[in-house]
């Protein structure tokens, strides 16, 4: 078996373990989850899990990294999009992708369970902190290095703005979970509006124009 095939097979097996762990978290939460639970969910052996992960925290880190990669992909791809319409229209389409991703019910339950564990588990808290820092670094560097971008915003301020936008999305997850009777269609629409307006407000201030003027830019 060649190295490429071996690597692909190993990655598929690793992914199956991560997905089994996510299903376990959705069922019973993270705090009492054991590797034996994950092996049972996967239909494999405990020894097979140890071939890929030394402990539960390493699996949690893999779950967090996968979510972070997903968020970065949406952000970077949206930043490179040069579709038709105004800046405001393209930004709205971009923010819609974020909101829909964060309103995914399964992903929300896993993310909230991990966040709850981070409150009492310092290692999990460090995993989330490192993932967040990587997220802000990648996105802010992408914006700064994009030759088509001319927003004169200092990197530290940009990262603070990213953190606040992310906090709205994280809060959206919690709201959807703990307010099951809320109109999700309205919640989605309001979240998109708030994100679009907030980002346009930050950018318009750096350009010395109004939000309305900036939203009409090509």
Regions found by a protein language model. Give the residues of each.
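Amphipathic alpha-helical packing segments from all-alpha helical-bundle domains
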Residues: 89, 103-112, 122-149, 160, ...
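Short, basic, alpha-helical segments at the C-terminal edge of helix-turn-helix-like DNA-binding modules
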Residues: 35, 65-71
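Solvent-exposed, amphipathic alpha-helical segments
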Residues: 16, 20-27, 70, 74-78, ...
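Secondary-structure edge/capping motif, primarily at the C-terminal ends of alpha-helices
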Residues: 79-82, 119, 176-180
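Short loop-to-helix capping motifs
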Residues: 55, 117-122
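Helix-turn-helix
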Residues: 16, 20-58, 62
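C-terminal peripheral helix-coil segments that are non-catalytic and often amphipathic
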Residues: 1-2, 137, 141-145, 168-218
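Hydrophobic alpha-helical connector segments
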Residues: 62, 75-108, 155-165, 188, ...
